[in-house]
Amino acid sequence: MKTKLFFLSALLLAMQGVCGCGGDDDDKTTFQSRWSGCKNESYDTRSGNQLPWDEECVEYEAKDGGRLYLKHVNALFNCATENVEVITSVNGNHINIVEHAIGNMSANCICPSDVECLLSGLSKGKYSISIYRNMISDAHLQFSFSIDYDESLKGDFRK
């Protein structure tokens, strides 16, 4: 039994390594992602003003080497969320991002948090970006917007 549990655990860890950095035929991958955990306060990084906890936005900025930094500000998750796994796929000029909550989701509350990721392998051009939140088994579209990627790109998208 212990041997089966060990092999199952090893398989799950290997699958997380493969699936956690989604990619496609063009080898565009997320090579960094971060989840802030529940926040007590939220601030607009452009103005420094405090944001209401239910005001979500996506900040984005081009980085050198064909990279794109994305920050989903005030993403709402269950207070019992233990971590958020970011899964990406790039198909042509369409970028899909799934923010997958990990935990038992038993708390009767939600809290704002920030989810960040860094995509690589992009080239100059127009891209559509769709961000989905997956809290249990269903992924729900949160944001869908377009960018014109080049080395000077910097902005945000607000609902």
Give the positions of each predicted feature.
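A short tyrosine-centered beta-strand micro-motif
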Residues: 127-129
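Sec-dependent bacterial lipoprotein signal peptides
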Residues: 1-19
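Short beta-strand elements
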Residues: 142-158
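An anionic, turn-rich surface loop/hairpin at beta-sheet edges
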Residues: 98-120
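Contiguous segments within soluble domain cores/interaction surfaces
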Residues: 52-53, 66-105
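Short acidic/polar inter-strand loop motif in beta-rich domains
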Residues: 103-106, 135-142
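Bacterial Sec-dependent N-terminal signal peptides
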Residues: 16-37
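Short, compositionally biased P/S/T/A/G/V-rich stretches that sit at domain boundaries
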Residues: 31-63
